[in-house]
Structure formats: structure tokens, C-alpha cells
Amino acid sequence: MVPKLFTSQICLLPLLGLLSAEGSPHARPQQYSRAQWFSIQHIQTAPLHCTSAMRAINKYQSRCKNKNTFLHTTFADVVNVCGNTNMTCPHNASLNNCHHSGVQVPLTYCNLTGPQTISNCVYSSTQANKFYVVACENRDPRDPPQYPVVPVHLDTII
């Protein structure tokens, strides 16, 4: 009985390795800091249709991301939100590094509607003006030195 249990545990190890090698569906490309990846995924000063805008994100992940929100503002403006009062992150109560925007910004919400093959992801676009909540962290050496604290995660749209 014991050898069988031991063998079954050993058999799970390669599977666990495959799962971790695959990575999270939201894993950032290693060449980017968390703030740089935040900017690629969520900052778009001028609205583009989602099908076009999502190509840049999908090419890094080699898959069609199910949904995404683009804030039509500047990275510097979102950095300024990091200076607002800390709050518990609405979508992750264990984190206390979130900040409410305090002002509404124009944004585009993209939702995957078409084929899920990387060569032809199709999205619907919904435009709105909303508040947002971002998680912020101390900058990575790859981030602009003028920003000691930078946004790394778009937690909620309100």
C-alpha cells in the first residue's frame, strides 16, 4: 500500500510541473516590469476598437484574453492615483495597496465574442466614464525613476 501511494504522488509531480510551466493566464512577459505590463494592458490615450487594440496584448500571451479594460488617460495620471489614500483592494481583500481614482475617466471595456484562436480574436467594445481602483507598488529598476510608486494592477472599475 505505501509504495503505491508514493508512486501516485510521484506521478503527480510532472503534472504539477506542466501546470506551473504553462503559467497563469494573466502572467506578464518577463521582459517587462509589472508597471510596464500594466501600461501595455490598460493605458490607451486614444480609443481604438478592441479587436485591434487587443492584438498587442494577445501576441505576448499567444492566446485570446477573455476581457480587458483600457483607461483613456496617461500613465502619469494613473501614477498620481497611487498617491491617493490606501484602501483594501475590492477584488482581493488580503491586499491593502489599492487606490481609488477619485475622478471618472473615459474607458473601453473589451469582451471576447468571436473565435478563440490567436490569429482571429474578435471583441466587442463598450465605452463608459467610470472611476477605477488600482494596486500600486514601489517601482522596479526598469520603471521610470521619476515615479517611486507605480500602478501594477487594475483591480476594479466602479
Curated annotation (Swiss-Prot):
<dbReference type="Pfam" id="PF00074">
    <property type="entry name" value="RnaseA"/>
</dbReference>
<dbReference type="GO" id="GO:0003676">
    <property type="term" value="F:nucleic acid binding"/>
</dbReference>
<feature type="glycosylation site" description="N-linked (GlcNAc...) asparagine">
    <location>
        <position position="86"/>
    </location>
</feature>
<keyword id="KW-0325">Glycoprotein</keyword>
<comment type="function">
    <text>This is a non-secretory ribonuclease. It is a pyrimidine specific nuclease with a slight preference for U. Cytotoxin and helminthotoxin. Possesses a wide variety of biological activities.</text>
</comment>
<protein>
    <recommendedName>
        <fullName>Non-secretory ribonuclease</fullName>
        <ecNumber>4.6.1.18</ecNumber>
    </recommendedName>
</protein>
<keyword id="KW-0378">Hydrolase</keyword>
<feature type="active site" description="Proton acceptor">
    <location>
        <position position="42"/>
    </location>
</feature>
<feature type="signal peptide">
    <location>
        <begin position="1"/>
        <end position="27"/>
    </location>
</feature>
<dbReference type="InterPro" id="IPR023412">
    <property type="entry name" value="RNaseA_domain"/>
</dbReference>
<feature type="active site" description="Proton donor">
    <location>
        <position position="153"/>
    </location>
</feature>
<dbReference type="InterPro" id="IPR023411">
    <property type="entry name" value="RNaseA_AS"/>
</dbReference>
<keyword id="KW-0732">Signal</keyword>
<keyword id="KW-0255">Endonuclease</keyword>
<dbReference type="InterPro" id="IPR036816">
    <property type="entry name" value="RNaseA-like_dom_sf"/>
</dbReference>
<feature type="modified residue" description="3'-nitrotyrosine">
    <location>
        <position position="60"/>
    </location>
</feature>
<dbReference type="InterPro" id="IPR001427">
    <property type="entry name" value="RNaseA"/>
</dbReference>
<feature type="glycosylation site" description="N-linked (GlcNAc...) asparagine">
    <location>
        <position position="92"/>
    </location>
</feature>
<dbReference type="GO" id="GO:0006935">
    <property type="term" value="P:chemotaxis"/>
</dbReference>
<dbReference type="GO" id="GO:0005764">
    <property type="term" value="C:lysosome"/>
</dbReference>
<dbReference type="GO" id="GO:0051607">
    <property type="term" value="P:defense response to virus"/>
</dbReference>
<keyword id="KW-0458">Lysosome</keyword>
<comment type="subunit">
    <text>Interacts with and forms a tight 1:1 complex with RNH1. Dimerization of two such complexes may occur.</text>
</comment>
<comment type="similarity">
    <text>Belongs to the pancreatic ribonuclease family.</text>
</comment>
<dbReference type="GO" id="GO:0002227">
    <property type="term" value="P:innate immune response in mucosa"/>
</dbReference>
<dbReference type="GO" id="GO:0016829">
    <property type="term" value="F:lyase activity"/>
</dbReference>
<dbReference type="GO" id="GO:0004522">
    <property type="term" value="F:ribonuclease A activity"/>
</dbReference>
<feature type="glycosylation site" description="N-linked (GlcNAc...) asparagine">
    <location>
        <position position="111"/>
    </location>
</feature>
<keyword id="KW-0456">Lyase</keyword>
<feature type="binding site">
    <location>
        <begin position="65"/>
        <end position="69"/>
    </location>
    <ligand>
        <name>substrate</name>
    </ligand>
</feature>
<keyword id="KW-0540">Nuclease</keyword>
<keyword id="KW-0944">Nitration</keyword>
<dbReference type="GO" id="GO:0005615">
    <property type="term" value="C:extracellular space"/>
</dbReference>
